[in-house]
């Protein structure tokens, strides 16, 4: 079940725009703060917050879809 969910999240990330996917990966897997992610991507912190909201909502939908 966990492996299946991770595979679904991976597929969901593949469908995300590059900036959303990059922000999510930098934050969640590299442990960067939103400020650091914003600097790395050359965008504002509010943009990173929007990207993360989009990615987290999509992950939630994958994890809890019935």
Range-by-range predicted roles:
Residues 13-20:
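Short helix-coil-helix linker/hinge
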Residues 1-11:
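Acidic, proline/glycine-rich intrinsically disordered inter-domain spacer in sigma factors
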Residues 23-24:
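A short pre-motif secondary-structure segment
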Residues 41-65:
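DNA-recognition helix of helix-turn-helix
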Residues 14, 30-47:
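Helix-turn-helix DNA-binding module
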Residues 2, 30, 52:
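Short, conserved glycine- and acidic-residue-centered signature motifs
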């Amino acid at each position: 079940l966990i492996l299946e969910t991770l595979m679904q999240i991976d597929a969901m990330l593949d469908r995300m725009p590059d900036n959303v996917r990059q922000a999510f990966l930098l934050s969640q897997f590299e442990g960067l703060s939103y400020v650091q992610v914003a600097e790395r991507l050359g965008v504002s912190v509010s943009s990173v917050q929007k990207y993360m909201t989009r990615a987290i909502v999509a992950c939630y939908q994958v994890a809890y879809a019935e």
